[in-house]
Swiss-Prot record:
Gene behind the chain: CXorf65
Basic residues: bias regions: 170-183
GO molecular function: RNA polymerase II cis-regulatory region sequence-specific DNA binding
PANTHER family per the UniProt record, alphabetical: AB2-183, PB1 DOMAIN-CONTAINING PROTEIN
One Pfam family from the record: Il2rg
Any one GO BP annotation for this protein: transcription by RNA polymerase II
Region Disordered: start-end pairs: 136-183
Name listed for the protein in its UniProt record: Uncharacterized protein CXorf65
């Protein structure tokens, strides 16, 4: 299946989606003459980003799973924060690579970029919260012993049973005692 890719001054080309997402993005990047270091993605004509750039590089799923055949997509550059700074991984903007993009398209891309950045910050906060674990001193934590008190008790849990010879011995003693009393 094929899709149409629009870029620049109303230029377009066909792309086969029966390939891995990474291969597709690499091919599109080379067609629009962008360096390998630039991150790109595709957006629909409605302005909805496909977020293909978020997939792992070794992701082997076909692009046809995420893209509709015979549809038109715009190439967008994903702008990140300045390298070497704290905001290096921040999402600054999704810029369509069109000469004169529509204002509504820019607004739709800005809204999606802001939402993605908020999600990224939220994930960072959750990771930080997991790292910070309050450890109480051992004195305040009640220690649970293995169910025994300070008195020494037998470690045996089951009731004591006598074997057969023990019963016979006791019976014999009781009989002897009772017979002696009768006499």
């Amino acid at each position: 299946m094929f899709i149409f890719i629009k870029h620049g001054d109303n230029q377009q080309f066909l792309v086969n989606t029966n390939c891995a997402v990474v291969v597709l993005l690499y091919y599109i990047r080379s067609k629009v003459k962008l360096p390998k270091t630039n991150t790109i993605d595709l957006c629909e004509q409605t302005g909805k980003m496909k977020m293909l750039f978020l997939m792992k590089p070794n992701h082997a799923e076909y692009a046809s799973k995420y893209l509709t055949a015979r549809s038109t997509y715009y190439v967008c550059k994903v702008e990140r924060g300045p390298p070497g700074t704290r905001l290096e991984n921040a999402y600054r903007a999704f810029v369509p690579l069109l000469k004169n993009p529509e204002p509504w398209l820019l607004v739709a891309l800005r809204i999606q970029c802001d939402a993605l950045e908020r999600r990224r910050i939220q994930m960072l906060k959750m990771k930080e919260a997991k790292k910070v674990v309050i450890i109480e001193p051992p004195a305040s934590v009640p220690s649970k012993q293995s169910g025994r008190s300070d008195k020494k008790k037998s470690t045996r849990k089951s009731p004591t049973f006598r074997n057969r010879p023990d019963f016979r011995k006791n019976k014999g003693r009781q009989l002897n005692k009772t017979t002696k009393q009768k006499k």
